[in-house]
Regions:
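Terminal targeting/low-complexity segments that flank the catalytic cores of oxidoreductases
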Residues: 1, 26-29, 303
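Short, contiguous pre-domain boundary segments
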Residues: 6-26
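Rieske [2Fe-2S] iron-sulfur-binding domain
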Residues: 55-159, 163-173
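Short Pro/Gly-enriched beta-strand edge/turn motifs at strand-loop
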Residues: 45-56, 125-129, 264-268
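C-terminal catalytic domain of Rieske-type non-heme iron oxygenases
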Residues: 3, 75-76, 81, 87, ...
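Generic structural signal for secondary-structure transition and capping sites
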Residues: 43-47, 94, 211
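Non-catalytic accessory segments flanking enzyme active sites
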Residues: 24-67
């Protein structure tokens, strides 16, 4: 049980009035003690979005993800059931699989060759028949909660947690409304960065489009930041803006009404539905420590044979749009520790 020291607590009415709101104090973004508390109270108890369903579409498909220092294995069994486990052999603790891919019909530990079925059951342990009182029944992989929800895969380290819908009520319906083809998306590109910034710093940047005009000129040339709304829905939020065709970013038929949807979901995943049909981008955050966050920036299309325009758009995300945000959060993370920063900044509410 993590107990937070007084300097890392806030009053219950903190920022109750948005017109008088400030950011949380800088120390919450920089101090390891705050992060250690978040590991146990946030990330060990919350549903974390880890992938799109297309990455685990076929039997034997698997992915691995690092969540608060725990390597998690998600695999689709030969019976087509999705399961998740701690990616660690119960014998001596060696990691079983790395990266993403297709598993064999048994997962074999590279250390002592213990073999496990895809449902986590121990299939074979060399010499176990000669080991007195060897408990094969209690030598299975340790399971982790996993759910598929509105086209995406979520895991939860808390075996007693409710469902994804319990944590994010109404999110699934909104995702399907904003991107009706969500189930048919396929991964087209992934940009992985080990970002020197606190996970909340990155979330803050996403939640405030106050920076979109000056910091994202290509995005703002399409998505109209003066026709842009942000609504709160408990543990998720929705940003919505009307869009027009742009040669700098999103190209689509002139005269066609289109829009951008941006959804943040607790604690640290961001869904984006650009003003183009059959496309999404997702920012997956995997916090490493108080000032480091591993990020996957994934781009999805419904088609796999990408057009020249889609390839150019991927290049724009990789070379222009994504670096714009990375520079911002990295600079802020440094500035939060400066003697010249007064410890908190104002929230610039619209009114």
């Amino acid at each position: 049980m993590s107990t937070l020291i007084p300097e890392f607590t806030l009053p219950k009415d903190f920022c109750a009035d948005a017109r008088e709101a400030y950011t949380i104090p800088a120390r919450f973004y920089t101090h390891q003690a705050a992060f250690e508390h978040e590991k146990e109270q946030v990330f060990a108890t919350s549903w974390i979005c880890v992938a799109h369903r297309s990455e685990l579409a076929q039997p034997n498909d698997y992915i691995t993800r690092e969540i608060i220092g725990e390597n998690i294995l998600v695999v689709r069994g030969r019976d087509n059931v999705l399961r998740a486990f701690y990616n660690v052999c119960p014998h001596r603790g060696h990691q079983l699989l790395a990266g993403d891919g297709r598993a064999k019909n048994v997962i074999t530990c590279p250390y002592h060759a213990w073999a496990f079925k895809l449902d986590g059951e121990l299939a074979h342990a060399r010499n176990c028949e000669n080991v007195q009182n060897f408990d094969k029944e209690n030598s299975h992989l340790v399971p982790v909660r996993v759910e598929e929800y509105a086209g995406f895969i979520y895991v939860n380290l808390d075996s007693q947690a409710g469902t994804v819908e319990d944590q994010l009520p109404g999110l699934g319906a909104k995702v399907r409304e904003a991107c009706p083809q969500v189930d048919d998306l396929k991964l087209a590109a992934r940009f992985v960065t080990r970002t020197p910034a606190n996970w909340k710093n990155i979330v803050d940047n996403y939640l405030e489009c106050y920076h979109c005009g000056p910091a994202h000129p290509g995005f703002a040339d399409s998505v109209q930041v003066d026709r842009y709304w942000h609504t709160l829905h408990g543990n998720w939020t929705l940003q919505f803006g009307y869009a027009r065709p742009s040669e700098q970013s999103f190209k689509f038929e002139e005269g066609k009404e289109s829009s951008f949807h941006g959804i943040w979901l607790w604690p640290c995943t961001m869904f984006n539905m650009p003003p183009l049909e059959g496309m999404m981008t997702v920012i997956y955050e995997f916090p490493v420590d108080a000032e480091t966050t591993l990020q996957h920036y994934d781009i999805y299309f419904t088609n796999t044979d990408l057009s020249d325009e889609q390839l150019k758009l991927i290049d724009w995300y990789r070379d222009v749009f994504r670096p714009e945000d990375l520079r911002l959060v990295e600079s802020v993370q440094k500035g939060l520790k400066s003697r010249g920063y007064r410890g908190q900044g104002r929230i610039m509410a619209d009114g």
